[in-house]
Amino acid sequence: MDYSFDTTAEDPWVRISDCIKNLFSPIMSESHGHMPLQPNASLNEEDGTQGHPDGTPPKLDTANGTPKVYKSADSSTVKKGPPVAPKPAWFRQSLKGLRNRASDPRGLPDPALSTQPAPASREHLGSHIRASSSSSSIRQRISSFETFGSSQLPDKGAQRLSLQPSSGEAAKPLGKHEEGRFSGLLGRGAAPTLVPQQPEQVLSSGSPAASEARDPGVSESPPPGRQPNQKTLPPGPDPLLRLLSTQTEESQGPVLKMPSQRARSFPLTRSQSCETKLLDEKTSKLYSISSQVSSAVMKSLLCLPSSISCAQTPCIPKEGASPTSSSNEDSAANGSAETSALDTGFSLNLSELREYTEGLTEAKEDDDGDHSSLQSGQSVISLLSSEELKKLIEEVKVLDEATLKQLDSIHVTILHKEEGAGLGFSLAGGADLENKVITVHRVFPNGLASQEGTIQKGNEVLSINGKSLKGTTHNDALAILRQAREPRQAVIVTRKLTPEAMPDLNSSTDSAASASAASDVSVESTAEATVCTVTLEKMSAGLGFSLEGGKGSLHGDKPLTINRIFKGAASEQSETVQPGDEILQLAGTAMQGLTRFEAWNIIKALPDGPVTIVIRRKSLQSKETTAAGDS
């Protein structure tokens, strides 16, 4: 399409009007006038060069890198050139900036412009010049930004510093102004460079290279990646480094002292935490000694094998336990669990233990004391370690006479039993009830506590297995009592209350004691249960009942009991088993310590036919007490 037009016959619709020119180029020139259509004159005004009327091809200017197009002057008389959009004012300013940059020795000569061919039109020329000027300025900004970032990233500083001199565009602009700014940034970035080194120094503090990491001047051959870091560090001792070294030394101190502190406070940690809550000094001393003895004896019993613990205890007969002493010696020799269950244990009060400890300190024996009490004191002392015994003696020495008189009423009872067996008594009272003191509500006949004979109804329970009951709620006390079923030994510290305090105790806590003790009867009344053997018919559907409890159940380790009897089953018609019956044996297989899934697999593996089951059923008296407690 030909954009040329004749001046003699000019069509108003073909002619480019002023409004159209202003529409396509809002900023035409500084005077907002028309661009003359003589290309030679326009080039002479903008570029300051002379035209070539001989029609030579366009040449490239090496000073500013802009090609100049020259046309012959003969064609200007007849035809005018095509309309070319004039260049705005900012374009001429960019050309002037390129000229100034070319004359400046610190400028960036762009070798890419000298090798490119000349574009075909002015539009391509302008876009290329704008791209070259913007790219050169972007390179300068990138290079300056990299130098700024290298001072804050010391780990990557060596890589970036080695890459920058390879490019000619980034190496030259670091003149007076840029180098000054870069050195200033490095000076200000000297302090932040210490921050990334903190985890390295903490990790290497235990190694021999820790001193080299703290002092950069000591290391003779540092790694190449850390050389920029050491250059930015100040030569003198930095306060941040000194603070860091002191922090690492302080962090090492408690780590080295932890085992000794643990060893000193381990045996009596639980009792000491309970003693901080006590208000009365005399009572706190009593609780302190009782808790120390209880926790120390319990820990020693758990550390000893069962045969050794059974062999040490029979030398302390106690009233009703004297006929069983010979059988206890035989059980210790034979190692049978059935005969060792007859050994109920022994008890002694703290006054006897105090006399024995005083005898140890004074290197003499008390001949006036009972022989059985001396044997019981010796048996307890033999269970204690030297550190625990020394601390116990120090506790006893500082007691006054009034407190020493109260030691006669405090007894330490050690019971030997089977795993899972109850202690033979129930508890009453608690911090959440009217009676704040935890007492023995009931001693079950034929139980372990009844056979031993020391624990009586109304005695205050100070601790069980080293766990103090001072200030505990009723449910917490019952939980401690249930936890005592698992070990083969139990250490109970009780105190016999004075007769003056007994009426007040009974009058204030009859209702609370009956309700609280009834909730524990279902767990502790093993002596009142009857054991019977029943025979059931095993069908394809099973024995006709479901199980609950077992080891690892939702409520803890419970015995396997009958949960529900199915309708229409033979067990429902015969009424031989009832819900709540504990299953002891099933077809000659003991069910204690099994999970419900294991017991159910045993039932499914049985052949069809009659099956003998040994169950334990609670007596009527126990059920009535439980019902009264529920109501």
Swiss-Prot record:
PANTHER family assigned to the protein according to its UniProt record, in alphabetical order: PRO-INTERLEUKIN-16
Biased composition range(s): Polar residues: 195-208, 322-340
Record's keyword annotation contains Secreted: yes
Residues annotated as domain PDZ: 411-496, 533-618
Name of the protein: Pro-interleukin-16
Region feature Disordered, mapped onto this chain: 31-271, 318-340
Domain of life: Eukaryota
Keyword Transcription regulation: yes
Residues recorded as bearing Phosphoserine in the entry: S221
